[in-house]
Amino acid sequence: MIGQITSGLFGGHDDSKKVKGTVVMMNKNVLDFTDLASSLTGKIFDVLGQKVSFQLISSVQGDPTNGLQGKHSNPAYLENSLFTLTPLTAGSETAFGVTFDWNEEFGVPGAFIIKNMHITEFFLKSLTLEDVPNHGKVHFVCNSWVYPSLNYKSDRIFFANQPYLPSETPELLRKYRENELLTLRGDGTGKREAWDRIYDYDIYNDLGNPDQGKENVRTTLGGSAEYPYPRRGRTGRPPTRTDPKVKSRIPLILSLDIYVPRDERFGHLKMSDFLTYALKSIVQFILPELHALFDGTPNEFDSFEDVLRLYEGGIKLPQGPLFKALTAAIPLEMIRELLRTDGEGILRFPTPLVIKDSKTAWRTDEEFAREMLAGVNPIIISRLQEFPPKSKLDPEAYGNQNSTITAEHIEDKLDGLTVDEAMNNNKLFILNHHDVIIPYLRRINTTITKTYASRTLLFLQDNGSLKPLAIELSLPHPDGDQFGVTSKVYTPTDQGVESSIWQLAKAYVAVNDTGVHQLISHWLNTHAVIEPFVIATNRQLSVLHPIHKLLYPHFRDTMNINASARQILVNAGGVLESTVFQSKFAMEMSAVVYKDWVFPDQALPADLVKRGVAVEDSSSPHGVRLLIEDYPYAVDGLEIWSAIKSWVTDYCSFYYGSDEEILKDNELQAWWKELREVGHGDKKNEPWWPEMKTPQELIDSCTTIIWIASALHAAVNFGQYPYAGYLPNRPTVSRRFMPEPGTPEYEELKRNPDKAFLKTITAQLQTLLGVSLVEILSRHTTDEIYLGQRESPEWTKDKEPLAAFDRFGKKLTDIEKQIIQRNGDNILTNRSGPVNAPYTLLFPTSEGGLTGKGIPNSVSI
């Protein structure tokens, strides 16, 4: 929009020795309202003038006094503001004129230096030179905070939007390119400040706080064979007093100030809309007040009607100064809405999709199984390839962990087939959480959690839906781990107390699946594993590098969301520990699972084949054939995957035509080396890493990176509230074991099965916290940028990549139409299921809010 308007304003020039340009800035208070004391208002903009200078750098005329680097133009200064744009996102962009002295020898500028002599920072969007003699328009995409020059050790430099491989960079710009990368890497020392732009690595040694006692000590993750982990961004905070190997934590009230490189901080809407304020509000304000309110009443839901009142009526609270003060302390409209005391409930949540059409369909076996294919965690189910299922745990440490499910348990439900026949016909599947949970289960069950490790067998019916056959629940042997487990197998029934037992068995499976989803599928496999790619890309690939331009949108907000998560979500005593069954062992468990993480297996086709739910088939459109044809996540996902890969192939092929061009790209090779040896350094010796010697290896790797950051994260994140917002469907904790005959709990189960169910799963206060959390995590901010979209339409000057990106966007639009068509096909029973919840988690676009659809470019929430 800015470019179109400025073209009209500066289409020509009267003086051949002058070049006019347009600078676009954004109000600081719009972007970062939390720092009101130093907000840069429109009035301050009006007096910037001589306090902000610009110097163009020639790409063709050298400066003999500066090592033959590109010559600098005379400084030019901001002129009066031209106009203000207020986009739908409410960010106020202001455009200024700027006029540069010019001579023909200077030629085409390839970069510019900006100096801010003002007292505070501003956000620089772009600089556009409208009519450079013999060249035309030159556009600089900036999107960066510019602090006062005294804060920097080197000049702030921005490059034009023409990409260059390192070997093709104009000679006069090479030193500037190299020096900018050195600036971004830093020297690995010192505490990072708010204005720093340094990207560096550290291990997860900041989750606990030993200074606050033993209960706040947590295992350091990363840097060891026992607890390997992807690296996080380094903050340089000092160590704790108690343990010099553990980094100190900032106070909760200063959570917004946790360091990430300045341009990685949330933008205006997200900073005001989401994580730290929202979660601090819930944890610090709502939960203690609810504790006070509920002290005199049991911490239980007495019936499913009680649970439904969270959505239909809310929890009523009396008016009073306490809650008026509480409301005033929270600046977020989203959270204020939760705190209404005008006759509506303090915690009145939107009705989750899973109970919107029917209040009971979630309890059916069909829906229980369908959500393994189309729910919030559709990436675990695998084809059963040996019976009974065998454990991969070390028998010397854990004894016999193999399954006790027998043919007698299931053969009456196989439509006349034997177990072997069903397996040979690809009809048997398993949801297997046994091996992940068993090593920690004895310790987990010393907390308030009382749960099992589960295996669930399922049968693929002729109509394409899955039917549960049996659930095995296992506990560590009471005499010690070396004696294996004690297990019990439950099978479906709808008669008497046994039907209530079966419902509880499914609930224990859901507890397992919810914890594994939140910790492994979501946090580890998207948030944690992608952060090293963000860091390495900024440290080793210049902004001029085509691969930096390709990947940059897919890293937006990731470091900020992860830093905030370390501060209040995954830390000792944080929200995650307070809501999932793994409790204080949660993050340590994820490190053990990371041992089996394989980068090439994160590619969707490879993942489907590895889990046995697809086979390689060159005649199939995506190179694999699904063995469950109506598998919504896989069907939609393969189309998204193929669209991404086609786009990446077109893009990379434009810049790399041979293996030699890959090998001689020193930035690309340094990037990949650092990713393997530092970012994912605990796995640097794994044989499966691509060697980055061919264009195909680059294409495959970039496709996988983009898939993880965009579609995979969308699939496991934005369905949280639609499916887990109703806690009985996906409880996070179980608080007592399966009732045994002859016990009071068993008699209660016979007498009041619903109450017994609710007393077993997540307690009332945990439910309120958990539902609040997943509602926030499931929302899109209104400034979200989705797959197939870019923040700036002029992100590159190269026309062929722009055309390829346009084709990518059109392909995604076609995929949206196909998803709508599939969701309307009644034959595809897994698309909506008994709860009538159409699968839209991989629908590419969305509006803001709680939509259950939309694929953001990045792991941004």
Curated annotation (Swiss-Prot):
Pathway: Lipid metabolism; oxylipin biosynthesis. GO terms for cellular component: cytoplasm. Fe cation binds at H522, H527, H713, N717, I861. It comes from the Eukaryota. GO terms for biological process: fatty acid biosynthetic process; lipid oxidation; oxylipin biosynthetic process. InterPro entries: LipOase, LipOase_C, LipOase_C_sf, LipOase_CS, LipOase_Fe_BS, LipOase_plant, Lipoxy_PLAT/LH2, Lipoxygenase_dom_3. It is found in: Cytoplasm. Disulfide bonds: none annotated. Residues 220-245 are annotated as: Disordered. Binds 1 Fe cation per subunit. Iron is tightly bound. Residues 33-160 form the PLAT domain. Keywords: Cytoplasm, Dioxygenase, Fatty acid biosynthesis, Fatty acid metabolism, Iron, Lipid biosynthesis, Lipid metabolism, Metal-binding, Oxidoreductase, Oxylipin biosynthesis. It catalyses: (9Z,12Z)-octadecadienoate + O2 = (9S)-hydroperoxy-(10E,12Z)-octadecadienoate. It is an enzyme of class 1 (oxidoreductase). Its cofactor is Fe cation. Its EC number is 1.13.11.58. GO terms for molecular function: linoleate 9S-lipoxygenase activity; metal ion binding; oxidoreductase activity, acting on single donors with incorporation of molecular oxygen, incorporation of two atoms of oxygen. Belongs to the lipoxygenase family. Plant lipoxygenases may be involved in a number of diverse aspects of plant physiology including growth and development, pest resistance, and senescence or responses to wounding. Catalyzes the hydroperoxidation of lipids containing a cis,cis-1,4-pentadiene structure. This is Probable linoleate 9S-lipoxygenase 8. The gene is LOX1.8.
